[in-house]
Amino acid sequence: MFGHIQPVTISARAATEIRKIMETKNIPSEYGLRIGIKGGGCGGAALMLGFDKKKETDQEFIISDLTVYIDKKHTLYLIGKEIDFLENDNARGFMFIDPGKEVEIG
């Protein structure tokens, strides 16, 4: 469906932090970064990150030299998003940035 078009981008800061987590948490090498959505009730859908094996319904992308799995049903909700990593005195974590919209913390 999307061919070589990547639905999301991952900042260098976020990619570095993802690699650190994979190393320190001993994530198996056959796992990739799963990006998706969960929920959808009154609060709406929440964006999520995790590590997982590839599933039959996944599309596979190489983004910032990371293997990324996105369920085909979630791809349209993620188009144009950027994953960044924030670290300051008040907060530390991954953010989903959607140009033109408010920042969503995941």
Name each region found by the language model.
Residues K38-M48, V103-G106:
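Local cysteine-cluster metal-coordination motifs and their immediate loop/turn environment
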Residues Q6-R34:
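N-terminal first-folded block
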Residues M22, I37-G39, H74:
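Generic secondary-structure microfeatures
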Residues I27-K38, M95-K101:
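Immediate flanking context of iron-sulfur cluster ligation sites
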Residues N26-P28, C42-G44, L76-L78, D89:
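A cross-taxa feature marking solvent-exposed loop/turn segments within ectodomains of secreted
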Residues K53, D58-G106:
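Acidic and generally charged, gly/proline-rich low-complexity regions
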